[in-house]
Each structure stands twice: as structure tokens, then as C-alpha cells.
Amino acid sequence: MGALDEGCLNLELDIGMKNGCIELAFEHQPETLAIQDAVKLLLQGLHEDVNREGIKKTPFRVAKALREGTRGYKQKVKDYVQSALFPEAGLDEGVGQAGGVGGLVVVRDLDHYSYCESCLLPFHVKCHIGYVPSGQRVLGLSKFSRVTDVFAKRLQDPQRLADDICSALQHWVKPAGVAVVLECSHIHFPSLDLDSLNLSSHRGFVKLLVSSGSGVFEDESSNLWGEFQSFLMFKGVKTQALCRNGSSVKEWCPSVKSSSKLSPEVDPEMVSAVVSILKSLGEDPLRKELIATPTRFLKWMLNFQRTNLEMKLNSFNPAKVNGEVKEKRLHCELNMPFWSMCEHHLLPFYGVVHIGYFCAEGSNPNPVGSSLMKAIVHFYGFKLQVQERMTRQIAETLSPLVGGDVIVVAEAGHTCMISRGIEKFGSSTATIAVLGRFSSDNSARAMFLDKIHTTNALKTESSSPF
């Protein structure tokens, strides 16, 4: 019986037996399977081959990321807070705030992400929390991030997220008061219109600063609020930009601002697929804030469907040199913005492309032309992609147009790097492709990379939260 008992124990461990109930493995759970089926339908709506290597496992990866990113629906604040309240007496009898440790406690710069309920794209949240302890007890500092995560890992809007965090801490910790300030950053929506693309729209973000207060922080004109804001200003938070206008908060998502431009022709099956995803995440698709979400999400996604944009490369004739061919010199086209969608997770990545090539001094000073280069970058960006492939494709397309010597560098921020378990905020990725002279001439590559550094050092760049 000993061997049999051991075998039964191993079986229970393998299938995840808990409290007499069988817990299905993640990949076999109904919610995961439903999301995978919906994602397959969306990929087909983008005219993609769901069996193509590279996106064959995309439905599962998307399901995993979405369920991971909305796990807060199944989490409870009390599970994190109740075991982390520690006794701490006030400084002296009658001294300090409400019998606590003597004053305000501020926890700053808690990085999180949440999914925007208006468009289903992730947005970055930098959370700052202040509270005045009461009842001679304090909360373990790590639990502030845990509590924030419970509510961030849901479909949210910034103001409700701030209110949820504030009310939960007030209820479970029971301090004299709680103050919450959130710095939220949402990526812009891309446009298929090449003329509308510009560097600022790629490096900039829609930013919003919201707050919530309870107890002694209910009055935002109080001295305590001023003290809390002072601690935030030490870290460069521009508290004067706090949004106290409800309509501004509701319209902060770029998809809401452009709702009047929504296409009336949306595939009903694709809409049903997004509705199925919402249900599988534990949401109510009929909640008023979510009614237009499937259509907004599809408007964004359909930007990246497989299409044949006319680049008119066949009509392009490289400039010929008149007379004696002189020494070739380096030509550069830097900071050309692009948008793309990661084919592994169906999340955006965006950034800039730098192109360098050699051509004879006696030829046209800009033989290819900025507009054609931007069109090529635009063409390879607006589709399901991986950055490495996009960089190579741009180089291979340009090579015969510029005489073979070309270098392409792409720099991008990947949303999938922040909105999944890895959560690498502030990370970026650079890729390089070289052909012709650049593949063997180290000094040529160094000259081009120095051009990028010198040019960007002279510019004031807006910071990215990703």
C-alpha cells in the first residue's frame, strides 16, 4: 500500500488537488480556452495564418497575459493586510497623529500597470501613498504595493483605481486617513496616415495625475495634503497638474477622444470575440464603461492587418552620377517614428528607426528621399511583427536602392515588457541590421552610431514610462 499511497500523492500533486477539488491546469481551464478561441478568430480577421510559425502559440500567450493582467478580480485585500499590521506606539502620550508613530508615512514610486477599460491596452501607473497611522499600528511597507496591485490588475480608469486603493486601505488598515496620487501614462493611438506620424506622438504619452483622499485627507486644501504633496515634489511630481475635472479623466484614453471616427463597419464575429474575452476575464460586457470597448479595441487592432501599401518602389530609379565618381560619403536619416504590434502577444511596440547609407558625393545629396524611407519604415511597421525582422526587412528593401551599403538601427519600447509577469518598466530594445560595407567596416558603423548619439544629445527628449 505504501507504493500505492505514494502514487496517489503524486497524482494529487500533478493535477492540483485542493480541498478535495480538482484544479485544472491553466492551459485547460475554460477561461483560457475561450480566450484562445477568441484570439484565433481575431488573427483570422487580420488575415493572418494562425498556423504560421511565430504566431501559432500567440493565442495561448495572449490568454496567459490577459488573465495574469486581470488577476486582481480574484484577489482580496484582507489576505495581504491582516497579517502585516504591526504594533507601534506613538512618540509620547498626546504627541503625534491619532496615537500613531508621530506623523505622516509616505510610500512613493510604486510602479504598476493596468488595463484601460476603454480600449484594453495597458497603461503605466506610478503610485504614491500617504497615510497617518492610528490605533498604534502600522502596515508593512511592502503591502502598499500588494494592495495597489489587487486593483491595478483589473480593467480600470485612473480615478476609480485611485479611489479603490484609497478606500481599501482606509477600510482594512483603519488609519486616521489615506492619500493616494497616481501618475498614469497611456500610449497614443497610431494612425495609418503617414503624414500624421511625428516623433512627438511616439515619444509622448497621454498623461494624467489623479488623487483620492479619506479621513484627515478628505480636504485637499488641508495642511496634511500640502505636506504629502511636498514629499511628492521632492521626487519631481508636478502636483499642480492634479486633475480635478471628472470629464477630463473620462476622456483621457485616446480611443475615447477619437470615438467619433470609429468605423461603422466592424465584423460582428470579431466584436463577439472581444466580448467573449471580457466575459472570460470576469467582467460584464454590458457595464456601461465597457459597452464601446470591443469596437475601440478592434479599431486599434485593425490598423495592423496584413495589407499591401503602395510604396511604388518599382518606379524608383536611383540617381545616376554625372561625370567622375567621387568618394562615397555617409548619408543619414534619423529618428523616423514607427508603430508596430508584437506578433507574440498582440501588444504594441513603438519607437524610432535610424538609417545610414553611403553614396557618391557627385550624386543627389539625398538620392532616396525622406518620404520614401518613411514609407518603407511605415510599411514594415504597421503589421504583426518582431523588431529583429522589421529591422532586417527595412535594410534589405533599401539595399538595392542605395547601392548595397546600408545600416538600420531600430529603438523601441515594448508594451509586452511591462504588461506581463516580467514587468520590466523603463526597458527598451535596440536592433541593428548591416549590409555591404557596414557589415565589415567597424569605423563606418561607429561613425553612424556616433551620428545618432550626437543628434539625440542635442534634443530635449520627453521621457517614456515604458
From Swiss-Prot:
Catalytic reaction(s) noted: GTP + H2O = 7,8-dihydroneopterin 3'-triphosphate + formate + H(+)
Entry annotated with the keyword GTP-binding: yes
SUPFAM superfamilies: Tetrahydrobiopterin biosynthesis enzymes-like
Gene Ontology molecular function, alphabetical: GTP binding; GTP cyclohydrolase I activity; metal ion binding
InterPro entries, A to Z: GTP-CH-I_C/QueF, GTP-CH-I_N, GTP_CycHdrlase_I, GTP_CycHdrlase_I_dom
Secretion signal, residue range per the UniProt entry: none
TM region positions: none
Positions bound to Zn(2+): 342, 345, 416
A GO biological process held by the record: folic acid biosynthetic process
Keywords associated with the record: GTP-binding, Hydrolase, Metal-binding, Nucleotide-binding, Tetrahydrobiopterin biosynthesis, Zinc
Highest taxon of source: Eukaryota
Assigned EC number: 3.5.4.16
This protein's pathway: Cofactor biosynthesis; 7,8-dihydroneopterin triphosphate biosynthesis; 7,8-dihydroneopterin triphosphate from GTP: step 1/1
Complexes and interactors: Homodimer.
Task performed by this protein: GTP cyclohydrolase 1 is the first enzyme in the biosynthetic pathway leading to folic acid.
The family this protein is said to belong to: Belongs to the GTP cyclohydrolase I family.
Protein name, as recorded: GTP cyclohydrolase 1
Species per Swiss-Prot/TrEMBL record: Arabidopsis thaliana
Classification of source organism: Eukaryota, Viridiplantae, Streptophyta, Embryophyta, Tracheophyta
